[in-house]
C-alpha cells in the first residue's frame, strides 16, 4: 500500500484575513476526503503560536523556527515560513512514500485522495494539480455540499503538489517563503528537474473560495520580489544542467509570468532567464 503524507501550514489568522473562514472549510474538506481512503496522514507544520488553530486529528510535526525575515529586512515585517523548512519537516519526520502539499486555503473534493492514489498507481511520478475558483460568498463549513457542486473557473496557479519523498533530496528549494506569490516556483522547478512531472489542469479536485488576490498589496512587493529572484536563481541552476528544462510546459508558464512582471528591480538571474526565453508565447 502506498503511504501518503499531506502537509499543510495552519495559521492562527485574525480578521480581516480570508483565512479566518477559509481554514475551517479546508480542514473539514480534508476530513471528508479522508473517509474515502486509507494510508493518508495529514500533517501540520506551524509556528508554536499557531497551534490553537490546528485540528486535533492532524499529526503535529516539529514546530517551525525560522522565517524569511531572519534572512533579510523587508519594509513590513511578516513572519512568513520558509517553504524548505516546511517540506524538510514532513520528509524527515514521516516514512511516507509520497508527499502532498497544499496551502491552508485550498479545499479538497471528496474523491481527492482516491484520485491522487490512482495517478500514482498508473505511474505518474510527480504532478501538480491546478485549483478551481468558486464564488467568494461561501463562509460556512455547512455549505460544503454547495461548494462541491460549483463547477468553478479554471486557474493557472500552482498550489497542490504530489511527489515521491525519495526525490526530495534532489530538490533545490532556495529561500522562498510561503504566503506571497512565487512561493510555488522552486518546488515546481525541482519537480520538473527531477523528471516526469505533469500538470493536471482541468480536473475537479481542489477549490479556492473567491479570487480576492490580497497578495497583490503594495506593501508586500518586496516579498514578492524576493521570491521571484529566488525562483529565477534556482531555475537558472537547473537550466545550466539541462537545456531542455526550460522547454517543459510548467517552466514555460512560470517564465511567461516572470516576463510579464519583469522590472529593473528584478535580479540579473531574472533578466538572464527572460532573455534566454524571448520566443516564449
Q: Which positions does each model-derived feature cover?
A:
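Conserved catalytic core of nucleotide-sugar-dependent glycosyltransferases
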Residues: 76-79, 87, 91, 106-189, ...
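Active-site-proximal specificity loops/subdomain of glycosyltransferases
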Residues: 44-97
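C-terminal catalytic/acceptor-binding lobe
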Residues: 1-22, 26-27, 174-281
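Short loop/turn segments at strand-loop or loop-helix junctions that form parts
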Residues: 3-13, 47-49, 63-69, 129-132, ...
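Short, charged/polar "capping" segments at the starts of alpha-helices
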Residues: 16, 48-55, 135-138
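Short, hydrophobic beta-strand segments that form beta-sheet elements in well-ordered domains
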Residues: 38-49, 125-129
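Short beta-strand-to-loop acidic/aromatic patch adjacent to the donor-nucleotide binding site
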Residues: 96-107
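Short, acidic, metal-binding catalytic loop of nucleotide-sugar glycosyltransferases
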Residues: 20-40
Amino acid at each position: 500500500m502506498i503511504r501518503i503524507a499531506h502537509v499543510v501550514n495552519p495559521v492562527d489568522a485574525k480578521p480581516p484575513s480570508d483565512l479566518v473562514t477559509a481554514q475551517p472549510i479546508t480542514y473539514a474538506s480534508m476530513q471528508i476526503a479522508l473517509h474515502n481512503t486509507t494510508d493518508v496522514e495529514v500533517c501540520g507544520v506551524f509556528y508554536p503560536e499557531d497551534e490553537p488553530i490546528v485540528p486535533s486529528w492532524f499529526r503535529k510535526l516539529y514546530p517551525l523556527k525560522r522565517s524569511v525575515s531572519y534572512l533579510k529586512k523587508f519594509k513590513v515585517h511578516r513572519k512568513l515560513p520558509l517553504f524548505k523548512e516546511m517540506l524538510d519537516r514532513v520528509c524527515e519526520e514521516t516514512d511516507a512514500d509520497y508527499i502532498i502539499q497544499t496551502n491552508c486555503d485550498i479545499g479538497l473534493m471528496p474523491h481527492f485522495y482516491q484520485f491522487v492514489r490512482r495517478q500514482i498507481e498508473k505511474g505518474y511520478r510527480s504532478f501538480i494539480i491546478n485549483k478551481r475558483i468558486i464564488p467568494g460568498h461561501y463562509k460556512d463549513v455547512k455549505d460544503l455540499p454547495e461548494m462541491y457542486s460549483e463547477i468553478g473557473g479554471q486557474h493557472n496557479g500552482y498550489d497542490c503538489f504530489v511527489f515521491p519523498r525519495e526525490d526530495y533530496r534532489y530538490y533545490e528549494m532556495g529561500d522562498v517563503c510561503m504566503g506571497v506569490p512565487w512561493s510555488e516556483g522552486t518546488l515546481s522547478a525541482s519537480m520538473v528537474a527531477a523528471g516526469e512531472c505533469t500538470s493536471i489542469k482541468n480536473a475537479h479536485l481542489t477549490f479556492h473560495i473567491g479570487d480576492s488576490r490580497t497578495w497583490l498589496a503594495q506593501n508586500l512587493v518586496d516579498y514578492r520580489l524576493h521570491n521571484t529572484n529566488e525562483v529565477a536563481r534556482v531555475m537558472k541552476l537547473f537550466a545550466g544542467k539541462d537545456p531542455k528544462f526550460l522547454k517543459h510546459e510548467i517552466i514555460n508558464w512560470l517564465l511567461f509570468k516572470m516576463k510579464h512582471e519583469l522590472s529593473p528591480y528584478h535580479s540579473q538571474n531574472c533578466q538572464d532567464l527572460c532573455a534566454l526565453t524571448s520566443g516564449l508565447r
